[in-house]
Amino acid sequence: ILTSMLEIVARNYSYRNKAARLYELGKIYLPREDGLADEPKYLSLGAYGDGVDFFSFKGGIETLLRELRIADVRFEACTDNDSYHPGRCANVYAGGKLLGVFGQIHPLVAANYGVDTEIYTAELSFDAMYEMRGGIPVYQPLPKFPAVTRDIAVVCDETVTVGALEESIRRGAKGLLKEVSLFDIYRGPGVAPGKMSVAFSLVL
């Protein structure tokens, strides 16, 4: 399904569409030992152009999963998928189950499709998301106090994953945290070599 999405992106790009947000729902075919095939459904997402980067694309996936009321979502860096940029790719988990992968398509792969701009795609198991979706929302009264938003930046070793930092923040908040979202990773002047500054937005 990734190949199909890249072909769609390439077609839009060749038509001089400067930006696009795309999706496709389809089946993939996995051979079985009995000679037949499993045909799970997958949701493919694709985007390129102004306003699209790793963090905004990740935010879109988080919004989708939140609207489906899928709980216990986490992201882990993925470095062994040759289709994606090794530093901008992550696996998506929910409840310990792998839902899929997303990230920036490797520039060499994008070039093979005639696209010379950054492409972001996601491959998510539609069947798994359907099974894990939440039930009908339960009414909750409006909170007595408005939500509080705070931004924090954490300086850490480059080997520390964003997922590990998010988990530490959630544990430290002890149930007070409603949302946590990554919005920047900085390396450069002011930050020691081998370190990075990771910025999060918190809603309490």
Residue spans for each PLM region:
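A carboxyl-terminal module marker
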Residues: 22, 32-44, 50-204
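Extended, well-folded interaction surfaces typified by the phenylalanyl-tRNA synthetase beta subunit core
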Residues: 1-20, 150, 203
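Short beta-strand micro-motifs enriched in acidic
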Residues: 28-30
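Predominant activation on well-ordered alpha-helical scaffold segments within soluble catalytic domains
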Residues: 2-10, 26, 58, 62
